[in-house]
Amino acid sequence: MTRCASPLLFAGIASFLSARTGGRFRLIIGYETPENHDLARDGAAIIEASGGHALLMPRALPAPLTAFSVRMVMADGAVYVSASGEALVYLGGRAVDRSREGALALEAELTLIDEAVAACGDEASLPRSQGGWESVGDGMIGAYVDRCASRIASLEASGPHLASVSVTEASGLLTILLERLSVPVVEEGAALSLSISTDGRTLTTSLPDERVRTALADALTTSPAVPTGTGLYCVDPAFVLDADALCAAAALAVLGES
């Protein structure tokens, strides 16, 4: 489901999206760590020079923010550059059926991108624009927090079951979300511990995975577009059609095991 993040990948995606959309396309570019910024910016330059329009995420953020932005700005796709050197590729807008808008590209679609990459030649010869791309505003982060809080509040009509939690999450977004939901965050003596991978897609808790899935049973989507596996949960498919550990962790803290 991933590909090596490289300038050639951006060129291949540009070719793929141009063919899918029949013209100028919009691509969001997100990245996991500050060290990935230069590659993301180079990707934006390649996209602009290849007939597309690039929108860079405002800073290093978890992947669910990039997936969320695809739907919010009706982009035709997104690339998320991971710290591992791999890239997640999302499709949306005119490039995919509406039921899969904002979901990860299927293997068949990635194969077409691979073929486009193979036809691009060498990296040094790729055209690059000197500008033209935009930045996604910080307001997108607030919109994501608002949407998650609204979704979680809708899951528990009789009032939340709050528990003190401890949090390990690099971006700080989970703490912001928990504070919005009035969930106490503590350093010691927590009833529940929540740990999220830097890319924001995998949740590890002090509970076994089976108990997490039971607690989130009414929240989890059954959409075939969403990846499954230990630690991968999607609780808001209307906006993030991918594993979203941030939203899932906050939902677990509110819903508990009741």
Segments the model singles out, each with a brief description of its role:
Residues 29, 66, 79, 148, ...:
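Buried hydrophobic positions in well-ordered alpha/beta secondary-structure cores of metabolic enzymes
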Residues 9-27, 151-160:
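Glycine-rich phosphate/diphosphate-binding loops that line cofactor/substrate pockets in enzymes
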Residues 191-192, 196-258:
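Phosphate-binding and adjacent anionic-ligand microenvironments
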Residues 65-124, 195-214, 230:
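Active-site phosphate-binding/coordination module
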Residues 21-98, 189-193:
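Ferredoxin-reductase
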Residues 10, 36, 40, 44, ...:
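Short, highly selective alpha-helical patches that border small-molecule cofactor pockets
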Residues 2-4, 91-190:
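Gly/Ser/Thr-enriched, mixed-charge loops and adjacent short helices
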